[in-house]
């Protein structure tokens, strides 16, 4: 039997429309559907995973077990400002193992990391 492929990534959240709209703006995705139970966003070019946001009654209470790392096309500082303008907040800066990144929180407090970009010395060959 062939290995399974990943169909989608699902976030549990209190306000799926708000969180889906935030992530669509961050990733350049399109909001495909928003209804009373959730929301769905996809890459407009059909690349990447579909991301689903489902409503749950409880709020976030512990650190995420899984999070997204986003790689800027410019600098980390520019990307941090961009995602802050979309509703994210800065949680902490991390420098270890010869690299650095910034942990951010989406509008419902889910952690994600903004990595260093090409203007910060990152290259795909490194």
Language-model regions, residue ranges each:
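Vicinal oxygen chelate
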Residues: 2-8, 32-34, 39-42, 47-54, ...
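Short, surface-exposed ligand-recognition loops at beta-strand->loop->(often short) alpha-helix junctions
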Residues: 11-15, 71-74
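Short, conserved charged micro-motifs
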Residues: 17-20, 75-80
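N-terminal first-folded block
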Residues: 17-36
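Short amphipathic alpha-helices in soluble, non-transmembrane regions
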Residues: 24-25, 80-86
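Short, conserved beta-strand/beta-arch hydrophobic-aromatic motifs that form part
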Residues: 65
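Phosphate-centric recognition/catalysis
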Residues: 68
């Amino acid at each position: 039997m062939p290995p399974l492929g990943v169909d989608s990534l699902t976030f549990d959240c209190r306000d799926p429309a708000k969180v889906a709209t935030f992530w669509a703006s961050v990733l350049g995705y399109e909001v495909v559907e928003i209804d009373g139970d959730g929301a769905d966003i996809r890459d407009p070019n059909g690349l990447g995973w579909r991301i689903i946001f489902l409503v749950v009654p409880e709020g976030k209470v512990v650190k995420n077990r899984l999070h997204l790392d986003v790689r800027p096309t410019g600098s980390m500082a520019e990307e941090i400002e961009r995602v802050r303008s979309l509703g994210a907040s800065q949680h902490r800066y991390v420098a270890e193992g010869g690299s650095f990144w910034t942990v951010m929180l989406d509008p419902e407090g889910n952690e994600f990391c903004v990595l260093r970009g090409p203007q910060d010395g990152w290259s795909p060959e490194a």
